[in-house]
A protein has these predicted regions:
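Tandem repeat scaffolds
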Residues: 1-348
Length: 348
């Protein structure tokens, strides 16, 4: 079948159902608005083809060549595109559900506002792709290649990025909740204003990383290295950082309510105006830290070391400080008796 013949069927409003077009030469075909059901395009040449606003259900594009194709506003359901070449495709507002992109190349593609649900992107390449406000919900992403991709405002929900290629990836306001990033070398990576709630970053090296205004609520960061990291105004409520190293990190105005810093090292870190009521930090090292105006009320600082730390006007209300070394305690605000009575009052 020629590209013109197939295009005429589409223009005539026919539902293209059950055709075997494996290996067909259909480059440049205009199939916009077509309805395709169970069509086999395996190995077909569809380079530069137009599928704008097309509906594709249960179709096979395995190893097909779709480089430069236009799939904008197309809807794909239960389609297989394993090993397909989709490099440079235009997928603006494209929707995909239960599709298999395993090993496919979407390098340099435009995925702006595209939405994919319950799809497989294992070993797929999105290198250099533009994925602004793109969403991958409940998709598998093992070994995905995101090098030099732009993920501004994108949402990858519960992504497996343990083996993802992230060199040069641009994250900005990206949702990566429950991401698997444990044990990785992420030195210098930037996650500005990203959502990493309950993400697993345990044991990862985030030395010099940019995490400003990043939401890390409940994130697992045990044993992570965050030396010199920028955590300005980051939200670390309930984050788990036992044994982590944050030497020289900037935590200015960071929110650490209920965070666990047991045995962590924060030598020379800046916690100016940090909000950390209920902080759990026994045996932590706050040596040479700037804790000016920090709120540590109710914190567990048992055997913590604040040697050479600055605590000017810091709030040390009702802290647990057994065995703690706090030489600049006089510069801080101690327990407020009236507040303590109010907090411990109970009806008789």
């Amino acid at each position: 079948m020629t590209p013109g013949e197939l295009a005429r069927m589409v223009q005539d409003g026919e539902v293209i159902r059950g055709l075997a077009l494996g290996g067909a030469a259909l480059a440049g075909a205009d199939l916009s608005g077509g309805v395709f059901e169970a069509v086999d395009f395996t190995g077909a040449d569809l380079a530069g083809a137009r599928f704008r606003e097309a509906i594709l259900a249960n179709c096979r594009f395995d190893r097909a060549r779709l480089a430069g194709a236009d799939l904008s506003k197309a809807s794909l359901a239960r389609c297989s595109l394993r090993g397909a070449d989709l490099s440079g495709t235009r997928c603006v507002l494209t929707q995909g559900a239960e599709c298999d992109f395993t090993g496919a190349s979407l390098a340099q593609s435009n995925l702006t506002t595209a939405t994919f649900a319950t799809c497989k992107f294992d070993q797929a390449s999105l290198a250099g792709a533009t994925a602004i406000r793109c969403a991958l919900a409940s998709c598998t992403t093992a070994g995905i290649d995101l090098r030099n991709a732009t993920l501004e405002g994108a949402a990858l929900l519960e992504p497996d990025l343990a083996a993802a290629r992230l060199d040069g990836t641009r994250f900005l306001r990206t949702t990566l909740n429950k991401a698997k990033l444990g044990g990785r070398d992420l030195r210098g990576i930037a996650f500005p204003a990203c959502l990493l709630a309950e993400a697993d970053l345990s044991g990862s090296d985030l030395t010099g990383a940019t995490l400003a205004q990043c939401v890390l609520t409940g994130a697992a960061l045990a044993g992570a290295r965050l030396d010199g990291a920028n955590l300005t105004r980051a939200v670390l409520i309930g984050a788990k950082l036992p044994g982590a190293s944050l030497s020289g990190a900037n935590l200015t105005q960071a929110i650490l309510v209920g965070a666990d810093l047991t045995g962590a090292t924060l030598d020379g870190a800046r916690l100016y105006q940090a909000i950390a009521p209920g902080l759990i930090a026994p045996e932590a090292r706050f040596t040479r830290c700037d804790l000016t105006y920090a709120d540590l009320s109710g914190a567990n600082l048992t055997r913590a070391n604040f040697g050479a730390a600055v605590l000017a006007s810091a709030n040390l209300h009702a802290i647990q400080d057994e065995g703690a070394y706090i030489p600049d305690r006089a510069s801080a605000k101690g327990t407020d008796p009236e507040r303590l009575r109010a907090e411990t009052w109970h009806a008789r």
